[in-house]
């Protein structure tokens, strides 16, 4: 009986998710060593790719530029994330934006804009320690200051719930982070605990081959990637495209603003090619 009830619950979950969501975003990093077939990925229904750009300590993902070019040529939307650590968050944000801008300006064919994300998870495999909540706040505020847009915040559902409700986290800090859009990981079920956000925007339901959901509706592979990191957007495909364009950063906008006398981006540095 327990198994039967569990199966019914999973079926209901699938029906609920399919009714309002699109399984159309993939994320990648330098740990994905294969030559990614982005054309095949698009043919399988993927709309956007979010790729690691920078990680501790102040390093750059060597695959980022070439994959941005290949994904753009395949007609995919493009995003970038930074894996945060416990060092100076403003310097991290500047390093991240300079990397993204340099690769954007350095391509003949470039994406319309770049969706920006802070990877705010426990750091147990890079130097620099784990980013604190106050540092995450400083990071996203620096991104907003320089781009005019808040980035997304990525993390596991349980960790975000624990960290953001911990001692020393102020209501103001939660409020600032809630200005960002939420990308949350849960490989077992649809995320439910999203406070201070009203709901999730992207749900990473599988990574490294881990997924407890029905494979028919929640595939773990895509194109030539057998153990992909796949994500569901809370909305239709058209809604995803609108969301992406509304939140994406165009590096040329920052550069143009800074070139004008009295530009309205205080403290920003020109994101020149590196």
Could you tell me what each predicted segment is?
Residues 1-7:
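Positively charged n-region of N-terminal signal peptides that target proteins for export
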Residues 7-16:
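Bacterial N-terminal signal peptides
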Residues 22-149:
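Substrate-binding cleft of extracellular glycoside hydrolase catalytic domains
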Residues 22-29, 36, 169-274:
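Functionally critical loop-and-helix segments that line ligand-binding/catalytic clefts
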Residues 46, 100-104, 148-151, 157-159, ...:
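Catalytic cores of transferase enzymes with a strong primary signal for eukaryotic protein kinases
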Residues 58, 87, 160-162, 191, ...:
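Flexible, glycine-rich phosphate/dinucleotide-binding loops
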Residues 113-196:
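Catalytic domains of cell-wall/extracellular-matrix polysaccharide-remodeling enzymes
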């Amino acid at each position: 009986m327990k198994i039967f009830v569990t199966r019914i619950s999973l079926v209901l979950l699938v029906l609920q998710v399919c009714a309002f969501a699109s399984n159309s975003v993939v994320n990648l990093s330098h740990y994905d060593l294969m030559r990614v077939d982005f054309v095949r990925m698009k043919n399988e229904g993927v709309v956007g790719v979010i790729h690691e750009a920078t990680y501790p300590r102040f390093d750059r993902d060597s695959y980022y530029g070439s994959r941005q070019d290949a994904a753009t040529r395949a007609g995919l939307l493009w995003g970038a994330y930074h894996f945060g650590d416990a060092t100076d968050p403003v310097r991290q944000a500047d390093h991240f934006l300079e990397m993204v801008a340099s690769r954007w300006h350095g391509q003949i064919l470039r994406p319309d804009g770049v969706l920006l994300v802070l990877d705010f998870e426990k750091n147990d495999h890079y130097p620099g320690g784990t980013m604190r909540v106050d540092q995450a706040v400083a990071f996203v505020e620096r991104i907003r200051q320089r781009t005019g847009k808040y980035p997304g915040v990525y993390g596991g559902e349980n960790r975000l719930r624990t960290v953001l409700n911990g001692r020393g986290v102020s209501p103001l800090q939660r409020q600032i982070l809630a200005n960002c859009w939420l990308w949350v990981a849960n490989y077992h079920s649809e995320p439910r605990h999203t406070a201070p956000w009203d709901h999730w925007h992207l749900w990473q339901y599988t990574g490294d081959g881990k997924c407890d959901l029905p494979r028919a509706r929640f595939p773990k592979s895509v194109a030539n990637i057998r153990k992909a990191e796949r994500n569901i957007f809370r909305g239709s495909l058209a809604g995803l495209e609108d969301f992406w364009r509304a939140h994406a950063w165009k590096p040329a906008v920052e550069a143009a603003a800074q070139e004008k006398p009295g530009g309205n981006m205080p403290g920003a540095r020109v994101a020149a090619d590196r």
